Amino acid sequence: RENVIDYSLLEFCLREDLNKTAPRVMAVLDPVKVVITNYPAGKEEWLDAENNQEDESAGFRKVPFSRELYIEREDFLEEAPAKFFRLSLGKEVRLKNAYIIKGESVVIDANGNITEIHVSYDEDSRSGSGSEASQRKVSGTLHWVSIAHAVEAEVRLYDRLFIDEAPDSHKEKNF
């Protein structure tokens, strides 16, 4: 009997299993530098981050936070449309397990590329603090890494192996 299972079912099953067992870390694949202008130079904090949101028994890990961070380049637009739920100038977002930041200005190189984003942070908005500022609603939450503590890593991004949903249905092609 021939059987073709939808790829999205496999992805769903993998996600379900990994959500229960995989340790969480933050990585930035296409970094842009963020400078928190009102955060003291030389200061660093070790913030608590859940090891697994779906398993309280997994505990917490410490994540370093400092004045200079990396975020994903795609998480920032200088002039963002209304439905952009990430960082832009004049807009607030939360840094995961950290603080609320607001885009203030950018540094652009000779080729027109953004090389730095300058932001301010709300010192009272630390995640989990229970303060009124920490419970403020913002448009999105971004993952990040502290530049001073970043390590290089090899990342393998996998996608679908075949373009066709049912590659074996083409008898003239050799798969």
List each model region and its residues:
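Basic, alpha-helical terminal appendages of large translation-related enzymes
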Residues: 1-175
